[in-house]
């Protein structure tokens, strides 16, 4: 895996930096683990925009990734590592000893031909999945469950990981990449290691069209709109925000906390914001 800065043969390629991985599989995905997905361009069932800046983009098939990893005691061989257009991380196609195949999130260092294992007796090796009660304190883990059996929800993006800080009774403490310290049940499962493709965040798209390929539409500034469309809109000539910066719906846009309280707030030991 390497970062490649392209030659400035055009304005769009002048600042472009790509992540090139020659080891990725170049064929089609495993047909049995692929589903069609339709685009809705950010509209709901009545045709109104509910999510801005979405629309267009290249057609994609959804890869069915196994986030539960609950086939305990059955070794699986890594057949290939593939690109997945639906996420920043790469995925690995594994084949269990009984012939079943599945996609998993590819951790850093996972290579074709290696064996991965799930279950309480699995060795502490990158790609293996164990209950948190069987993982040594201080280990770096990814694809962590929030509820036992629900499937991985934390640390699934490229280059992300979680550190296991402590175990106290039925709960363990994890430090997330954001700085938040959170409790999860020790029966929740996690994979050993760091998610691969860690250079994903260093790429530069180079041109606006690359975002359009991804289905991301332009973001218009509020000060360029009319007053009916945005709190910053209107005025003669170029004007500023005219006060506190606000969202299109009137909420303060900078520093205002919008997170609602939840029942699971009791599981947060330390917030990511330093108070």
From Swiss-Prot:
KW Ribosomal protein (keyword) present: yes
Record field: compositional bias (Polar residues): 39-48
Organism of origin: Aromatoleum aromaticum (strain DSM 19018 / LMG 30748 / EbN1) (Azoarcus sp. (strain EbN1))
Quaternary context: Part of the 50S ribosomal subunit. Forms a bridge to the 30S subunit in the 70S ribosome.
Name of the molecule in the record: Large ribosomal subunit protein uL2
Keyword entries, A-Z: Ribonucleoprotein, Ribosomal protein, RNA-binding, rRNA-binding
InterPro entries per the UniProt record, alphabetical: NA-bd_OB-fold, Rib_uL2_dom2, Ribosomal_uL2, Ribosomal_uL2_bac/org-type, Ribosomal_uL2_C, Ribosomal_uL2_CS, Ribosomal_uL2_dom3, Ribosomal_uL2_RNA-bd_dom
PANTHER family the record matches: LARGE RIBOSOMAL SUBUNIT PROTEIN UL2M, RIBOSOMAL PROTEIN L2
Compositionally biased residues, Basic and acidic residues: 229-239
Cellular compartments per GO CC: large ribosomal subunit
Pfam families given in the database record: Ribosomal_L2, Ribosomal_L2_C
The protein's role, per its UniProt record: One of the primary rRNA binding proteins. Required for association of the 30S and 50S subunits to form the 70S ribosome, for tRNA binding and peptide bond formation. It has been suggested to have peptidyltransferase activity; this is somewhat controversial. Makes several contacts with the 16S rRNA in the 70S ribosome.
Family: Belongs to the universal ribosomal protein uL2 family.
Key word Oxidoreductase present: no
Region ranges (Disordered): 36-55, 223-275
GO biological process: cytoplasmic translation
Gene Ontology terms for molecular function: rRNA binding; structural constituent of ribosome; transferase activity
């Amino acid at each position: 895996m390497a970062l490649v800065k392209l030659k400035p043969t055009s304005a769009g390629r002048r600042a472009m930096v790509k992540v090139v991985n020659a080891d990725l599989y170049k064929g089609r995905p495993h047909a049995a683990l692929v589903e069609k997905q339709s685009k809705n361009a950010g509209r709901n069932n009545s045709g109104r925009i509910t999510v801005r800046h979405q629309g267009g983009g290249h057609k994609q098939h959804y890869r069915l990734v196994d986030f539960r990893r609950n086939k305990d005691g059955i070794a699986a061989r890594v057949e290939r590592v593939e690109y997945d257009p639906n996420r920043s991380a790469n995925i690995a196609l594994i084949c269990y000893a009984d012939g079943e195949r599945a996609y998993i999130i590819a951790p850093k260092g996972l290579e074709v031909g290696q064996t991965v294992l799930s279950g309480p007796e699995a060795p502490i090796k990158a790609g293996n999945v164990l209950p948190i009660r069987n993982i040594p304190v201080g280990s770096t883990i990814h694809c962590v469950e929030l509820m036992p059996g629900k499937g991985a929800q934390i640390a699934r993006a490229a280059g992300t990981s979680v550190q296991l800080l402590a175990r106290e009774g039925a709960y363990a403490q994890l430090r997330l990449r954001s700085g938040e310290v959170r409790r999860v049940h020790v029966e929740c499962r996690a994979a050993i290691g760091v998610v691969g493709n860690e250079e994903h965040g260093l790429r530069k798209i180079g041109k606006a069209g690359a975002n359009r390929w991804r289905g991301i539409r332009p973001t218009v500034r509020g000060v360029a709109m009319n007053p009916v469309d945005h709190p910053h809109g209107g005025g003669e000539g170029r004007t500023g925000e005219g006060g506190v910066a606000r969202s299109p719906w009137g909420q303060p846009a900078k520093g205002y906390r919008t997170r609602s309280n939840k029942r699971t707030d009791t599981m947060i030991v330390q917030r990511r914001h330093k108070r």
